[in-house]
């Protein structure tokens, strides 16, 4: 869909979309992003009235309990929220952290915008689940399990049409929804880069959560581009000393063509050609260096292993890789020959 560039043109096209949808019962597919249209459909099926005020007052007691339930999320997200707000300060905006139920846990914002946001209960303790507040970035990001923009009159409730919001979900190391990061502002202050900012910031939080959960395991950082290892673009695998896969972030699943449910049936040696012992030895000798490895389907990656692995002998390395072959249901083969020196960078 080609979205008009100007705020004014977009506002006009959204009034046309609302007229078609709410006035004539037609689907304005050419005028709305599909995630917004799906949200409108969910809200209508739930019996929400676009003319009413959404939800109730913030739950002071409930937010205290929610913060306790989500203390791990908050501890890793707090510095990211503060840094993100510094980037958008003085732009008539606010930064919001909500939990997996859509309850606002924390917020930072410019005073002039916060006072207006409070008029629609966009503050800690309020639920912004779709069935409470209609289409909105927090609730819709949770429902869609993906990053979304909700601009002006794309909000289901007319009273929220002064907002423009960008939100990205936050997942834990097992792929479960933990919460949502959101930037909200007056729609007239719309910034195209807001969605990119929340996606990047949510990725930072997810990376912190993953590394914290597997802090005492081996962490394999890898990517097809060597300059992406150590950046937000890197993929992460958590590996036991025996080569079992303990966890994978979304980037790792995508690069390796795996589903999360595949992990318990996979072993390090089923994915890469370089023996785990070689990686461990390299990590002990030169922790900052990269090693070139190939996937079992021929993909070329660059990797760095972190963790407190004990030194592994060649015999132990062969046993680990042989165990992986047995898990794969294949006959035992000779242990892979370590990569030649010119592949180690």
Regions found by a protein language model. Name each.
Residues 60, 126-130, 186, 259, ...:
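Short, solvent-exposed coil/turn linker segments
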Residues 208-274, 328-345:
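Signal-transducing coiled-coil/dimerization helices and immediately adjacent hinge/linker segments
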Residues 1-132, 136-152, 162, 171-242:
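Intrinsically disordered, low-complexity terminal regulatory regions
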Residues 107-109, 153, 210, 248-250, ...:
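Surface loops and adjacent helix of pleckstrin homology
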Residues 111-113, 252-255, 309-310:
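Short, surface-exposed beta-strand-loop junctions and turns on beta-sheet-rich folds
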Residues 181-214, 229, 303-345:
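Sensory coupling linkers of modular signal transduction proteins
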Residues 153-154, 162-167, 272-333:
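PAS-family sensory/regulatory modules and their coupling/dimerization elements
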Residues 85-86, 226-229, 270, 277-284:
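Short linear motifs in intrinsically disordered
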